[in-house]
Amino acid sequence: MARTRFLQGLDDLRARLLRMGGLAEQAVDRACQAYIDRDLTRCRMVLEGETQINITEREIDELAFDLLAMQQPMAVDLRFILAVTKINADLERVGDQAVNIAERVMDMVDLPKADLPVDIPRMAAAVSAMVRRALESFIEGKAELAQAVLEMDNVVDRMKDEAFIVLVKSMNEHPETTRQALDALLVARNLERVADHATNIAEDVIFWVRGADVRHNVAPEPPVQHEVTESH
């Protein structure tokens, strides 16, 4: 009976994290579109959604701690619970970055538009794809999907570095659009941080599935078990 309740708790934990992931992904998408369209309605939706993200984060942590206290989990279950708590924290921070972008848009909405030499929508699309792929790797329990996210992070890092170079140059050559260029640079930095959190999520999925710590560029160990295909 205790094992059955524990397994039900794992299912509930997984479902709650998927909901959290959906909220965070939605927040990023709305914030990015708000920046592209200067859409205050979407900005407000991001800010209002932060409360639910924070509530869900606390609920997940409480459930995870309850499950750890319920019984001594088997290795794969313990890794799952630990991964969920870490992914949960990263998703909350993804939501924070979405709020930062939304607040930036609200500050800049009255400024005249400037033709800046940077493709923020392209970077936003790449970052959104990273978040989506990281969540898919968790849903499917596939370490190879998570590994693809780690590779995508290099692309986003290059985009951010390129944005910094061209925007600083733009500020020097066109001081009248310095404020707009600075806003774009800050948004690019927010997007890079979202990508970093997506990378963390992918690393946690690899830890759960393979029992391998791939943080800090440590080469992954050979899988210690088959890819996880069950719900936990």
What do these predicted regions represent?
Residues M1-H232:
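Cytosolic, long alpha-helical scaffolding segments
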